[in-house]
């Protein structure tokens, strides 16, 4: 895309599709503002009414919000509920034969699970955990599983009997798995023999064996193994048991445990943390309410919709928008075992056509990859079923946004560019597809009931166009409740740096800019903000600008020490296929990229170093490992865990380039 065209495109406002808006839950900005006003007028009444209307309670709550021990807030106090019941049982009267889950395996196999079947399988699994493994309310269960339907059964079975599940992403190393098991003091670990990835078997059980060897996890009593790829594995007698052989002997009737609103539903350890893992603790009622509300508001989920979120269940997006959100709404959710590129880069588009997907939610990294590797693949498929597109995980640059909007959504689907975190449980800032005028790469407005503000360090609001810290200034139901076993770390991490009206507010760790209309644009992590000669520059906006060069497929920018400026900008750049970059071309390309930066951001944003690389190191969830790139740029030893990488060879190739340049 030409720079001038891109600048104009980024300013353009896209109004919701009129036909879609007419039938949407929130049809226009007036209705959005009415909800915001309602929440502001009586905050507790607003949330209390939603909880009464949307959730099924065994015993009603008697207090909406208890702030006596802030920041350890309690929502819907003394209410009794069960998340599994709300995701399955309450739908059985009218939807027992409706499809709950559509599963497609990497090798092309598929399975369709109705709500009745889901109820039966979850109950049998819950009974297995209780009867054979002595799992009780409050026990922690580690789930180290691939994207298969049994993973959902395990989650909901834990919720049914009151156990606290903690999913560890199946790409994590044995060491990372061990750390999480020990921090949670888990009684049981559930894994699979393996899965299929890129058309080949990929093993998981050996990683569990290594994590548990030499009694390294003394809290673990037993391990439960799901047979998926049927490759040979080792068994430890008395410890390892096969799920497939045991589950069908269990009754398909299991009464749901009555849980307090504030009882923990799950722990999820934040990715990329250093030192002791940080177990984000989420509650039952508040989390589920917001999972359901954001499905209804942000995706405008409908009874006959097929919803597909491409995230892995090892991340919060998979928890909320693959499992709990869709099922709480009684919707149909899709699960794909494998990758976007096998057998080719048309896989996702074929699935959208075949399963008539209505709402599609994925990451900017995936969009950029599909654009670069298979730009014309979508043209081979009928994507007319799509009504809403969504992005999650990082800011999306205008070029990727434009391709997603025009080629995938046929210029008729709203893109909900959602901002939220593991700690928030669900969306915080997002357009509403039937109401919000959208702009490329802009998260737009806080959802009703959410008080998200951009503040300076002293707690004052930033002026329009100024960078600041994105904070949430009032508690909300799905917020993180604690860091497992570490209250001090919870306070230090989120409620210790910025005050508003004398009270500490939730600090997200993200930087943002608010414009004169209240629209919020995320500029990246505050630790991804580079201070160049006293000017704070978000690496995300630098990357977005560089990506507008026609030869650049994608890039990652990090800050490096500079004796004059404090910090300088170092870019790792992936060029389009066939592009060659000798010394002369390299200097010319650097000049062109810096020109784009000077136009888009200002002359202060200037690349000091560029390394042209064949690819960027990414986790299997699609996130770029920026800390690793920063170590490379600063010529420091690589100490990061590389086991989560999609392709370790990328790092080896980058290191070879570094050695050649030394």
UniProtKB/Swiss-Prot annotation:
GO annotation, cellular component aspect: cytosol
InterPro entries hit by this protein: Ac_CoA_lig, ACAS_N, AMP-bd_C, AMP-bd_C_sf, AMP-binding_CS, AMP-dep_synth/lig_dom, ANL_N_sf
Residues holding ATP: 393-395, 417-422, 510, 525, 536
Residues the record lists as binding Mg(2+): 549, 552
Named cofactor requirement(s): Mg(2+)
N6-acetyllysine PTM positions: 623
EC number: 6.2.1.1
Name of the top EC class for this enzyme: ligase
Binding residue positions for CoA: 197-200, 317, 533
Disulfide bond sites: none
UniProt KW keywords: Acetylation, ATP-binding, Ligase, Magnesium, Metal-binding, Nucleotide-binding
Post-translational modification: Acetylated. Deacetylation by the SIR2-homolog deacetylase activates the enzyme.
GO biological process: acetyl-CoA biosynthetic process from acetate
Reactions this protein catalyses: acetate + ATP + CoA = acetyl-CoA + AMP + diphosphate
One of the record's GO molecular function terms: acetate-CoA ligase activity
UniProt similarity note: Belongs to the ATP-dependent AMP-binding enzyme family.
HAMAP family: Ac_CoA_synth
Function: Catalyzes the conversion of acetate into acetyl-CoA (AcCoA), an essential intermediate at the junction of anabolic and catabolic pathways. AcsA undergoes a two-step reaction. In the first half reaction, AcsA combines acetate with ATP to form acetyl-adenylate (AcAMP) intermediate. In the second half reaction, it can then transfer the acetyl group from AcAMP to the sulfhydryl group of CoA, forming the product AcCoA.
PANTHER family for this protein: ACETYL-COENZYME A SYNTHETASE, ACETYL-COENZYME A SYNTHETASE 1
Name of the protein: Acetyl-coenzyme A synthetase
Gene label: acsA
């Amino acid at each position: 895309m030409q720079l001038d065209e891109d600048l104009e495109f980024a300013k353009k406002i896209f109004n919701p599709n009129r036909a879609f808006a007419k039938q949407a839950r929130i049809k226009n900005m007036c209705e959005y503002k009415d909800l915001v006003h309602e929440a502001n007028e009586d905050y507790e009444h607003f949330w209390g009414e939603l909880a009464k209307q949307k959730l099924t309670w065994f015993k009603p709550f008697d207090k909406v919000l208890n702030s006596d021990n802030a920041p350890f807030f309690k929502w819907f106090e003394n209410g009794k509920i069960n998340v599994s019941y709300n995701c399955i049982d309450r739908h059985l009267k009218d939807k027992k034969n409706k499809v709950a889950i559509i599963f497609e395996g990497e090798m092309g196999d598929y399975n369709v699970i109705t709500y009745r079947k889901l109820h039966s399988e979850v109950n049998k699994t819950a009974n297995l955990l209780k009867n054979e493994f002595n799992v009780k309310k409050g026990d922690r269960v580690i789930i180290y599983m691939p994207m298969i339907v049994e993973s959902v059964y395990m989650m909901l079975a834990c919720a049914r009997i009151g156990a606290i599940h903690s999913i560890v992403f199946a790409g994590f190393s044995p060491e990372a798995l061990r750390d999480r098991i020990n921090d949670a003091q888990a009684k049981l670990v559930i894994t699979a023999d393996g899965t299929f990835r890129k058309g080949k078997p990929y093993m998981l059980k050996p990683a569990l064996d290594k994590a548990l060897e030499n009694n390294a996890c003394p809290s673990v009593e037993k391990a439960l193994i799901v047979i998926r790829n049927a490759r040979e594995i080792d068994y430890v007698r008395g410890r390892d048991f096969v799920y497939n052989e045991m589950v069908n002997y269990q009754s398909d009737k299991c009464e749901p445990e009555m849980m307090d609103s504030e009882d923990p539903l799950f722990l999820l350890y934040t990715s990329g943390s250093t030192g002791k893992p940080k177990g984000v603790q989420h509650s039952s009622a508040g989390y589920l309410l917001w999972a359901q509300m954001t499905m209804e508001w942000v995706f405008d989920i409908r009874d006959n919709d097929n919803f597909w979120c491409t995230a892995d269940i090892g991340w919060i997006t998979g928890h909320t928008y693959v499992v709990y959100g869709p099922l709480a709404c009684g919707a149909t959710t899709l699960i794909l075992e494998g990758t976007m590129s096998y057998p080719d880069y048309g896989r996702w588009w074929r699935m959208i056509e075949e399963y008539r997907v209505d709402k599609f939610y994925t990451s900017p990294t995936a969009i950029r990859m599909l654009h670069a590797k298979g730009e014309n693949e979508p043209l081979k498929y009928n994507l007319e079923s799509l009504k809403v597109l969504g992005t999650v995980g990082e800011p999306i640059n205008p070029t990727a946004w434009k391709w997603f909007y025009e080629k995938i959504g046929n210029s008729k689907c709203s893109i909900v560019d959602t901002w939220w975190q593991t700690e928030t449980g669900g969306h915080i800032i997002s357009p509403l597809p039937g109401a919000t005028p959208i702009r490329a790469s802009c998260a737009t407005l806080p959802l009703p009931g959410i008080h998200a503000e951009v503040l300076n360090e002293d707690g004052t609001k930033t002026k329009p166009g100024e960078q600041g810290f994105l904070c949430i200034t009032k508690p909300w139901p799905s917020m993180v409740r604690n860091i497992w076993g570490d209250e001090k770390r919870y306070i230090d991490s989120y409620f210790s740096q910025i005050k508003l009206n004398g009270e500490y507010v939730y600090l997200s760790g993200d930087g943002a800019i608010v414009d004169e209309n209240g629209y919020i644009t995320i500029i990246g992590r505050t630790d991804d903000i580079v201070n160049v000669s006293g000017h704070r520059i978000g690496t995300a906006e630098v990357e977005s600008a560089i990506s507008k060069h026609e030869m650049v497929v994608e890039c990652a920018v990090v800050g490096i020490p500079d004796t004059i400026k404090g910090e300088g900008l170092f870019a790792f750049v992936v060029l389009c296929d066939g592009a060659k970059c000798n010394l002369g071309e390299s200097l010319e390309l650097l000049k062109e990229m810096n020109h784009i930066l000077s136009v888009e951001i200002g002359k202060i944003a200037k690349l000091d170093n560029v390394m042209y690389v064949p690819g960027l190191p990414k986790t299997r969830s699609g996130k770029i490992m920026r800390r690793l790139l920063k170590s490379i740029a600063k010529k420091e030893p690589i100490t990061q865990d590389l086991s989560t990488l999609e392709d370790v060879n990328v790092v080896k190739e980058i290191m070879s380039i570094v050695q050649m340049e030394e």
